[in-house]
Amino acid sequence: MATLKGQNFRIAIEGTGGDFYVVAMSTGCTVTLNNNTEEGTHKDVVGLANQPVVVSKSWSLQADSLNVVDAGALLTAIKSMEPLAVMFDETSTTDNFSTEHADFARKGQAYFSDLTLTFNDRENSAKTIQMTGVGPLSTVAIGDTFNGPASLAYTKGQFVRLFLSSDNTVAPSSVVGAAKQMSMHVSVSLEDATTKDTDGEWQIMEPTALSYDISTTALIRSDDTITSAVTAKGVADLETIYNNGTPVKWKIANTSGANNRTASSTIVSGSAILQTLTLNGPNRQNADYTANLLGFGAYSVGS
């Protein structure tokens, strides 16, 4: 019997109409099944060795992908804090998405618990999604199938940029100049809601809060600007925002034009506090700074 190759072990998420769609342009996935244990030793047990007892079961999954075209849909889904149906299965080697209904294939309900979007200079943009199961996993049926991925293009990180304002009253129109890296991380806090009324061993989780942060790293220019013609935020501007200690407006947008500084379609926007500003001066390397912004209130998806 041949060994299953990783490209033929895939995760699919419920989409429009209740159909399952594989995570497009996936580079890896992980499913974790966990027995939650409690120490069961007591004074009647002879010796010093532990004797754990299983008290509940839980599961989670993670998928990594080079596709960020669906960033808006994912940002909307995690913001809704509603569970979605997910499924994992072996897929056919002829197309890498037709389900084989393997013995280990399972489906269940899960919350989006973590989403990271990464847009780095001269790299393919990427995402990582994590989902936390709600209740049991069940075996898949013959009628459970995956829909194949759409034909999608890579998104280069240099064409997606962070724009900032100087306060929370005006639109963010100034790009972060000389940027090298940028990412957005969204997290949903989940709390154990399993009670004595819950049937079976599977843990029940419910969302309690949503938080997000944005991180960007940029080079420090010796004159603090790129050129006099560039409207961009430099390290001195970020220090002013830090000193003010009040929210500013931000947006992550696709860009075009000279030096990739003209915003076109907005992916996501909102307000944030500049939480930390770190300046780095390594020997024989370019000096840079990293700004971490903590989300203030809800974000908005799209323009």
Predicted feature descriptions by range:
Residues 68-113, 228-268:
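Short, acidic/charged, Gly/Pro-enriched secondary-structure junctions
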Residues 136-138, 298-301:
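Short loop/beta submotifs within extracellular cysteine-rich repeat domains
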Residues 1-4, 89-93, 100, 141-169, ...:
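Charged, amphipathic alpha-helical segments and their flanking helix caps
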Residues 1-68, 104-143, 151-222, 266-290:
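Solvent-exposed edge beta-strands and adjacent loop segments
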